[in-house]
């Protein structure tokens, strides 16, 4: 009997065990599609990014005009640039939905997978931040100035640290050059960590909507989930192309069409939409160091999720109290996103402070309490 090359060849068998013969729970829903969509986003962003890097000049006198040159003179440069910019938005949409799925269905109990995933989120946020600086528009420059300046709140070493990151006494040519280097390098670190993320996932296998052990009911990844993922990919690409071709600047900031000017501050400095919730939490605390700590904790709180799980059941599928809290958390994050884009004046300040308190209360206090109450309701 001839052996199947797919199962014996050293390289092919890794691909086979990861994407073809991988035993998968038969009941995983469309919420399990986002992992593959994120992989597709990463490939898309890296590809478009490399093509952009071929024509971009990381120098303050050339950066803005080189981006204009890409969109005007390079063959399909407008498409590559707009797909890269809007691809980032789609990337974060998928990330947030992927994390939401993990929180709802208790996927965080696979600790190693969850921790590598949260680290991936931090790396992606860092990559997006340094990438936003590269076009060297007004919002690029002032965003870089404001966010890097937050590090000056660190006691004793703060100011030195900020100047070390800037490579001078202000955001200047040295800053742009190193940010370009980081923006080019970090996606490859993300790819490496993604491999580790998948390695840990395949140690345990996927979770499923019931949160129960699914070893008794597994089906092969191909053709069932490969085609399901392909459908998700088609829908995502349709959304991306619709956004890119019909309203490419919908999610961007008009200020970024003005070249960076250190002598003129834009009326409202704000980051891209996917950072607005964290920006709102940062602004809701009057103290600089307190704001920075709250900003960091708003993301780092994800590392605490496995520790804070008190329920006997894994998923929120059969836990009404936790469901109410989960959807309140989502609504609250949308409120924070809205507040992050508003000017610093009443009533926005008060709403932002309330929403920030609620954000941490739900995650750190109310959800563990709800889990304990639901355990009592079971007995």
Swiss-Prot record:
Pfam families: Cytochrom_B_C, Cytochrome_B. GO terms for molecular function: metal ion binding; ubiquinol-cytochrome-c reductase activity. The keyword Ribonucleoprotein does not apply. The chain crosses the membrane at residues 34-54, 78-99, 114-134, 179-199, 227-247, 289-309, 321-341, 348-368. Heme b b566 binds at residues 98, 197. Binds 2 heme b groups non-covalently. The gene is MT-CYB. This is Cytochrome b. It comes from the Eukaryota. Heme b b562 binds at residues 84, 183. Component of the ubiquinol-cytochrome c reductase complex (complex III or cytochrome b-c1 complex) that is part of the mitochondrial respiratory chain. The b-c1 complex mediates electron transfer from ubiquinol to cytochrome c. Contributes to the generation of a proton gradient across the mitochondrial membrane that is then used for ATP synthesis. It is found in: Mitochondrion inner membrane. Its main location: mitochondrion. Its cofactor is heme b. It is a multi-pass membrane protein. It comes from Emydoidea blandingii. Belongs to the cytochrome b family.
